[in-house]
């Protein structure tokens, strides 16, 4: 039994993998703004709770926000969403404190590995994943393994430039909300979020439909550029708004075909949507653990 923990900027999800199945446990607030916040102390409290109930655990698999040195199990870089997180020695601390093997990897890397564990992807040798949320995240899987780069930053696509702007400013949920808020009547601006936009778009709201098409244009341009460079078998799209599959799939596929101009390299890439939701990171963390600590 392997404990799985998914560390995000606002919440920490927990569970365990046993016999290839995920059992979800409690979710804890990250609460990084509280006085004397310590991620290691927070994890200790969580692991104390879990191990009190499941003392038979054989290891700990972590998925985490930030740029992760998976070899050392440390946070190579993190922004101030989690203050003081950069440099945190996650694996070394857990292994020394609990005498359990530990693995750590980036959250989008783990999400991709979780999705690729599904039976439909068992023969896939190359894949990309993009997650659309507050920002835009990415992960790269080539020749049957995650590609992380020499500084563990492969997939940090939020810094990519589309039409002179970082992609996060034109293809994230945050960008979509800002686009719509600027254009709707001020009496409804406080209501505008991703769910509201899609509900209104489905009801025929022209500005919301226009905003989604604006996002899709930029996102699909980014996908075409990435696919042209790496020629993956599949691109998997995840994140909250990508759950709107019925609305987004035809828009994205149509724009993708329009942009790729029928070239062979792009025509053979499948555009897929994530299926595991919030479970992907924990399942993928387990997949990374198995590679680092083979039985």
Sequence positions of predicted segments:
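A cytosolic small-molecule/anion-sensing beta-strand core signal
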Residues: 18, 64, 142-143
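A short acidic/small-residue loop/turn micro-motif
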Residues: 30-32, 83, 154-156
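Conserved phosphate-binding catalytic cores of ATP/NTP-utilizing and phosphoryl-transfer enzymes
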Residues: 91, 101-127
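Short beta-strand segments
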Residues: 6, 61-65, 129-135
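A charged helix-plus-loop insertion that forms the helical arch/lid used to bind
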Residues: 74-87
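Active-site nucleophile and cofactor-binding loops and adjacent substrate-binding regions
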Residues: 80-83, 103-109, 129-131, 272-278
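ATP-binding/phosphotransfer module of carbohydrate and carboxylate kinases, centering on a glycine-rich
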Residues: 1-59, 69-74, 96-99, 117-126, ...
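Glycine-rich phosphate-binding loop of actin/hexokinase-like ATP-binding domains
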Residues: 122-174
